[in-house]
């Protein structure tokens, strides 16, 4: 009978799936995370001030924004900030695994005066999205917009 081995394999698969999901749902599982993690969801990056990789991505986002301005990219929907900026720091960051890793950064930067230095007026906060594909050794600025005043 050809159906007997197939029935056995399906039954075995169901038992394995039930065992795998039943263990995670058990309240006695001591290794369970404190907060639920959504697969494919965003996760906070802690200690962004001392995280050199995150600060480097913020610096890249501002440099890429300025490069696009030099090449006529101002005012477009993907880059609506019409002034060159001087990077200050990343103040907040999240990451999300997509086709690569998407970093959602809150970047503090100030407007640059025409001589290249930071202009008076202090830092403003911008939302930047950078996608890193390590296996291709690439990173791309997807968007760079003024941050909304509400969190």
Curated annotation (Swiss-Prot):
Its main location: secreted. The keyword Signal applies. A motif (Secondary area of contact) lies at residues 96-100. One of its GO terms (molecular function) is cysteine-type endopeptidase inhibitor activity. GO terms for biological process: defense response. The record marks 40 as: Reactive site. Keywords: Plant defense, Protease inhibitor, Secreted, Signal, Thiol protease inhibitor. It is found in: Secreted. Residues 1-22 form the signal peptide. It comes from the Eukaryota. Residues 40-109 form the Cystatin domain. GO terms for cellular component: extracellular region. Gene3D superfamilies: 3.10.450.10. Pfam families: SQAPI (PF16845). The keyword Secreted applies. Specific inhibitor of cysteine proteinases. Probably involved in the regulation of endogenous processes and in defense against pests and pathogens. Belongs to the cystatin family. Phytocystatin subfamily. This is Cysteine proteinase inhibitor 10. It comes from Oryza sativa subsp. indica.
């Amino acid at each position: 009978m050809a159906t007997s081995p197939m029935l056995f394999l399906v039954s075995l698969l169901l038992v394995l799936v039930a065992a795998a999901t039943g263990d995670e749902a058990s309240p006695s599982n001591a290794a369970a995370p404190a907060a639920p993690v959504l697969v494919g969801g965003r996760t906070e990056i802690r200690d962004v001030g001392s995280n050199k990789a995150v600060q480097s991505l913020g610096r890249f986002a501002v440099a890429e924004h300025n490069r696009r301005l030099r090449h006529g990219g101002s005012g477009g929907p993907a880059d609506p900030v019409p002034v060159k900026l001087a990077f200050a720091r990343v103040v907040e960051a999240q990451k999300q695994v997509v086709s690569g890793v998407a970093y959602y950064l809150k970047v503090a930067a100030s407007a640059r005066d025409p001589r290249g230095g930071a202009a008076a007026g202090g830092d403003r906060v911008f939302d930047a999205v950078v996608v890193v594909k390590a296996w291709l050794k690439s990173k791309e600025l997807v968007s760079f917009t003024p941050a909304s005043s509400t969190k």
